[in-house]
Structure formats: C-alpha cells, structure tokens
Amino acid sequence: KQVIFHIYQIETMAESLKEKTAKGLFWGAMNSGSTQVLNILFGIFLARLLSPADYGIIGILTIFTLIAGNLQSSGFTQALVNIRKPTDNDYNSVFWFNVLVSLTMYVVLFFSAPLIADFFHQPCLTSLSRFVFLSFFISSFGIAQNGYMMKNMMNKEITIVNFMALISSNVVGLVLAFNGMAYWSLAWQQVIFILVLNIGRYYYTGWRPNFHIDFGPVRKMFGFSVKLLVTNIINTVSNNVLTFVFGRFYPINDVGNYSQAYNWDTKANSFVANTVGQI
C-alpha cells in the first residue's frame, strides 16, 4: 500500500508540474505578446510626435540605466527563485540590499550627471539623467516582490501588472509628447512604468519588508547571483556599446535612428526569451 501511495504521489506531482508549466507558457506568451503589441502601437504614435534626436537623447542614457539595474538586482531575483523554500528573511535581505545599493549608485550618478552631459556634448543630459536614473532606484523597491511572484509562479498576476504598467506609462508618454514635452515624455514613460509595476507587485504579493536587516542570506546567495551579474553586464555592454560610441562621436539624430532600429530589431528575440523566462 505504501508503494502504491508513493507512486500516486509522484504521478500527482508530475501532473501538477505539467499543468503549472503549461499555464506558465500560456501567461508568458500573453505577457510577451501584449508587451510587443502595445509597444508597437504606442511606438508608432510616439514616433510621429517625437524626433530622432529625442530618441537619441534617451538612448545615450540606456547603457547607464541598464548597467545600474544589473548591479542593483545583482541576480538576486533568480537566486530567490533558485532557493527551494525561501524564507521571509531571504526576501527581506534581498530587499534592503537592493535598496541600499541602488541609493548609493543613484547618488554617484546624480553627481556624475554634469560629466555625462559634457562627455556627450548635450547640456540637457544633466537634469534629464538625474530624472531618468530615478527609474532604477524606484525599481529596487520591487525586486524582492518580483522574485516572490516568479518563485510562486504567479504568471497571471505578472502579466496583469505588466499590462497595467505598459498602458499607464505609454498613455502618459503619449499625452506629454502631444503637448510638446519631447524627450521628457520618454523619460516620464520609463519612470511611470517602473512605479506602476512596483505598485502592482506590492498589491498582488502582499509581502512587506521589515526593519530586521540581516545580510546573511544575501551572502549565501552571492555565489550564484554573481555569475548572473557578470553575464548580464557583459550582455548589456555588448548590446549598447555602439549607442554609447555613436552618442559621443555622431550627431544625435543618427543616435536616435540607430537606437530605434536596434529596438525594433530585437523585439522578436525578446518575445521568445521573455515567454520562456517567465516559467
């Protein structure tokens, strides 16, 4: 009887895993598909209202925000998913580590903004970069929640949150662009997206950080997360180094045209990667 019961348990677990995987693929495809469709639709309207120079100005800052985002998360989202049964202390440790690292990086980049503007010969980058860099600082408050949702395979909720963030941010960007805000409309679009994303994560997870700060769990995860961190930074630099070089030596209109062409070219690949990665 014990053997039969054990076999039954294994079969039940296998069926449950298959069901979760199927649902994960479905909602992953829904998430990636809706993201692509919305970005295309809103992107067409925005492209008619904004100039290549506007996209170029924002494109220059992309490599800074992405590298800062990689350093901020440090692969801990995947590390949390990799833990068999993460505790509340694990999530809390990752939360405070991300917030402190992000705050440090934001302060450094805030005071580096004039140097960035001088390097690219774009005075507007001083104030613009300080605002755009808020996006990765705000993002740090939702990384632990994102890990929680991925670990618990809350794929439906992830899709809903992402959809609401996309709608909200694109509508704001479109309204601002229509009213002549130029590159500021793209900057606000980024910040609003992260803000709504975090609000949704807090709403669906119900998890809240506490002030019992212990970085012990982070140290245990570091061996796993640092490998992802290095890989992500290498990918980020290789994918955005040309935009960085163009921004320094070429007219800003050319930077914008290249940045937009690259973004549209990578949409198909990101659809597949995001669909599988959400499982």
Where do the model's predicted regions map?
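Membrane-water interface segments that mark the loop-to-transmembrane alpha-helix transition
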Residues: E19-N39, I60-L61, L66-P114, S127-F133, ...
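Residue-level signature of transmembrane alpha-helical cores of multipass secondary-active transporters
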Residues: G24-S32, T62, N98, F131-V132, ...
